Amino acid sequence: MHLIIYTAALIAALLQVATWDFVQRAGEPPDFGGQIASLSLAYEPTHVPFHGKDPSVEAVDHDLSLIAEIAKKVRIYSVEGTTAEVPKLAQKYNLSVTLGLWLDDERDAAGNLIQEAHDRNRQEFEKALIIARENWNVRELMVGNEIMLRARMEYPDIVDPETGATQLSPEARIRLDDLLGYLREARRSITKPVSTSEGWSEWAAIPELGAEVDFITTHNLPFWEQIRADNAMAYAFEKYDVLRRIYPGKRILIGEFGWPSQGYNRMAAVPNPLKQAQVVREFLIEAERRGVDYNIVEAFDQPWKTFEGSNAGPYWGIYNSDRQPKFKLVGPVQKDRPWMPVGGVLIGSFITVWSLSRRRPTFGHAISYAIAANAIGAGVMSAAVYPFDYYLNVGLWVMWVIGFILMLPLSIITLAKVHEISEVLLGHQPIRLLSPDKLAPALPDPAPLVSIHVPAYKEQPDMYKATLDSMAALDYPRFEVLAIVNNTTEEHYWKPIEEHCKQLGDRFKFVFLPKVEGFKAGALNMALKDMDPEAAVIAVVDADYQVHKDWLKDLVPWFEDSEVAIIQAPQDHRDGHETLLKTIMNAEYAGFFDIGMVQRNEDNAIIAHGTMLMVRRSAFDLAGGWATDTIVEDTELGLRLMAEGWHAHYTRTRYGWGVLPDTFLAFKTQRHRWAYGAMQIIRKHWRKMLPSSTMLTPQQKYHFVTGWSYWFSDAVGCAISFMNLVWVPLIILAELAFPAVSLTVPVLTAVL
């Protein structure tokens, strides 16, 4: 048996290792043996709310030393704070500088000047001019960054309905005029080339802007255009060629090109470390071949962009935020994390061996469970590594912690389900399951008297009478039927039942309880006084169930085993074909009774259901009868009897058929009652599940705890749905983002 378990664990572990090897396989993009023409360097803006930590001069100097190892030039976007020291510090490393100055929108939508923004822009502008004049290594000046791109996104172009021609909106026009004013002033003030940086589409749409710069600086970023990584380089140069045709003879600088290593997909554009290395290397080689001037964005990852609601934005660096290279420019590219598959295999193997060592698994059962356990192990490792791959803001930390915690019970529930299904479908044939071909003990003479209790609350009389008629046809010598109508004062409900019992004979007793407390259990307890004192077995059937004539004849003999207190037959339904909803509900019920109950029965841990249930009278009396402090008195009684050492048996053979809820609302109400009842049982009997308790076997505890966890998961699912709704405004207003992919492996395992 252990050989089967270890073999399955080994095979599943090898499959996991192979999967990790495929996912983390080394890529071999083309080598780039030269130096990068230019790299962007940007720090957290100090004047923006929630930002503001300026790097030290020593930190900037260290960054420039790293850039100098692989690049000839550095591009900066502002002269704010310590960034203003970059040109001077870069001279030590013989780095040229593309000097940028940042311009905020200084007018509102109506064109009114925002004085604070204007003053800040003027200060930035004049400071940049001074730096450009005083530093020999400043090669060019960038006045503003993507000003018109932002303006056109905020205020879309106006389309002429007749000609289809487009023109700038009045609001965007105001921003263009302000930008042109700064450009003209800069060109008059310094002798070095002046430009501004925009997306290629802005240069194509606004030739007026191109006329006011010494050279074109275009941002060609295929990722944001939703272009596949394989086509990124070709797309960038295609747009470059478009601008060459529009501006013949004018120098064109690809001011930004790059690819993120992490983040959400943008349709076909997929960020990951291997694709980043591939895209950047291919571009560098082609740019060198063509003699194109370019700048790669970024030198370093920018974690502060997570506070701006950007998912891929922080991950464009050649170096990560710890200043470690994410890939080299030559040689294979691989994420070297051998501890991830090792951790996943250890988790998967431990779960497999620990869980199956108490069973008698077949190879099919063992391998299916081992594969699921290894999938969970891989998922746990993927989720655990998330903080190492992503820069987490407060919202990401909150959601990652919550997601990781919730992933653990999901994993447990998933493994329990896989164990249940694979053991029943692929495991050994059940030993304890009662079946027609299993020889039952001989029925003694006289046969035990069975008292069948049929409680009803405002049930339709015709349906109730059909149930009683089916019992009248039972092929069993000694039984009685108690037709219990409780809390139903309307005569049209109970009077027909009373009359029908008289017609069916002395075996049928009508018990009318107009006012009862204590839920269904209260009615059943009050009806006990009407039960025949000689009754040896109590059977309970819902008022909508029509029973098979052999029900008692086939199952009562098993009570000859003096240790047996419960015999349970499955619930089934005679109207499952009527609607699609009922077909789905019936299939869901059947899955539990044909799989879950069969497996639980092997460990003497079935759930007692309040229909098609038979209980030994003496055990019932010793247990104290039906408990009135829960709405699921049947399940609670079953748990008490098992805790007292009694045995329960189950048969998969159908002996009764009821009716399904007619509407989804009725189905939901039923499930709410079951879930609420389960919580009542947990509150009452949780101490029996503690390791120190000896009232239940470990296997019984396992089944009850995992069974209850399904109800917990449903409740948590509702809570998470509510949390998702609450989280939406936090994402929008507070920019608290949500980690996604790393937590989905256990979810996918659960679905599959």
Model regions: which residues?
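Aromatic- and acid-rich polysaccharide-binding/catalytic face
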Residues: 93, 99, 139, 145, ...
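Short, acidic, metal-binding catalytic loop of nucleotide-sugar glycosyltransferases
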Residues: 468-478
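N-terminal membrane-anchoring/stem segments of glycan-assembly enzymes
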Residues: 349-444, 703-727, 731-738
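Cell-envelope/extracellular polymer assembly enzymes that use nucleotide-activated donors
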Residues: 448-451, 480, 485, 636
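Substrate-binding cleft of extracellular glycoside hydrolase catalytic domains
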Residues: 85-192
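Aromatic-rich peripheral "rim/lid" segments of glycoside hydrolase catalytic domains that contact
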Residues: 32, 46, 52, 265-276, ...
